[in-house]
Swiss-Prot record:
It comes from the Bacteria. This is UPF0275 protein PM0489. InterPro entries: DUF5376 (IPR035416). Belongs to the UPF0275 family. It comes from Pasteurella multocida (strain Pm70).
Amino acid sequence: MILSFEYINSFNRLIPICDSCSNYPIGSYVATYIRLFGKNEFEEKGIYDDIVNISIENEFVGFDGIDAFIEGDKVRIGFYLYGKGDEPEDYDPEESEFEIIDRKELIYILKRWKVFIHKPITDPHYQEIIDTKEAYL
């Protein structure tokens, strides 16, 4: 999966964004998920810590804007996701929309994103291209 990290100008303020550069479905939900990680999400103990803690095998790690579940060495990211036993009575699995990403890749992306959003902005047109294959090197 190929992602880009860059900035957009919103009301004279530069906002970091993550976009998918891939032509296939996987990437759009992942990019949305990454965008929701601001500086505070890295500073506070919580979701990021759960993702990088490989002893956690089954955990909700989503936000208000998108759901995510750790399932061993994979993470499901999408909408209308529930853990086993947490489904509401009227739950229809066909309504769930999600992508599955290797946890190792997600950790790699999040570490790169953390560095990106903490860097001082010296060029508003600066961009980084992230290839998740690098997670396995």
